[in-house]
Amino acid sequence: MTQDNKAIATKWFAAFNAHDLDALLALYKDDAEHYSPKLKVHQPKTNGWVRGKKALRGWWQDAFDRLPELQYEVMGMITDEEQVFMEYIRHVPGEDDLRVGEVLEIRDGMIVGSRVYHG
């Protein structure tokens, strides 16, 4: 059976933009990994990586607390059987917009990894 990775990514954006941590984390496997250059800045000891839902929750809660108006504007998605490449614009009032690429790795209908890329 083919999983609908675009639908998973669409749910991801909806949950993220709603700052709904429970809905966002429901898309992830318990032991999922996430990489972001912003993690290196805000939590240097992580070297950019967090692993597991508890760590993901802590990272995103921190981001939503610091940036209560943070929103992502979807520019495009490319999907295959195991991943989605998402391009979006990160909007935060008072900051320059940031164009971002992110890859979601998906297995058995759940996100097992995600990696963020930006300059």
Annotate the PLM regions:
Residues 1-119:
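C-terminal and inter-domain tail/linker signature
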